């Protein structure tokens, strides 16, 4: 699809739902072992920073910003629907649980800006927050570029 066709395609979606969306799946590695509280702090900060960046760049409403982290010894989920209230984080890690490697799935839905802007703000937030917390990451799948389009077009 050419750039002009893609712009028209995006505008059609904009008129239909006015929602900007982004999702990604990644692997995370902590060079130093993280406690569950450190992981929760990083995950909560990630959702807050993504949401704030989207709002600062034109979003006027949070649909849902959520993340699911899975490590060998447990899982953690975080959800944010109101920036003022902050994220809600749940997990099944034991009190002394630690991890170094995990999978992270992230979904971002906001109102008022388009997918490319949501993607850009999300990726910049990931870079900023993970760097601050000393986390390395590798994006396994960027659903904005692949499955999103295929699913939409019946692929």
Task: Give a label for each model feature.
Residues 2-155:
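P-loop NTP-binding site
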């Amino acid at each position: 699809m050419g750039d002009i066709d893609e712009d028209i395609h995006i505008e059609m979606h904009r008129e239909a739902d006015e929602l900007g969306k982004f999702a990604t799946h990644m692997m995370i590695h902590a060079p130093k072992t993280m406690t569950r509280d450190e992981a929760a702090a990083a995950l909560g900060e990630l959702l807050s920073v993504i949401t704030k960046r989207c709002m600062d760049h034109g979003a006027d409403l949070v649909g849902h910003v959520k993340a699911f982290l899975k490590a060998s010894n447990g899982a953690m989920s975080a959800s944010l629907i109101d920036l003022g209230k902050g994220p809600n984080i749940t997990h099944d890690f034991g009190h002394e649980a630690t991890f170094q490697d995990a999978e992270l799935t992230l979904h971002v839905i906001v109102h008022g800006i388009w997918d490319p802007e949501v993607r850009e703000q999300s990726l910049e937030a990931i870079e900023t927050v993970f760097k601050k917390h000393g986390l390395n990451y590798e994006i396994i799948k960027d659903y904005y570029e692949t499955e999103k389009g295929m699913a939409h077009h019946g692929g």
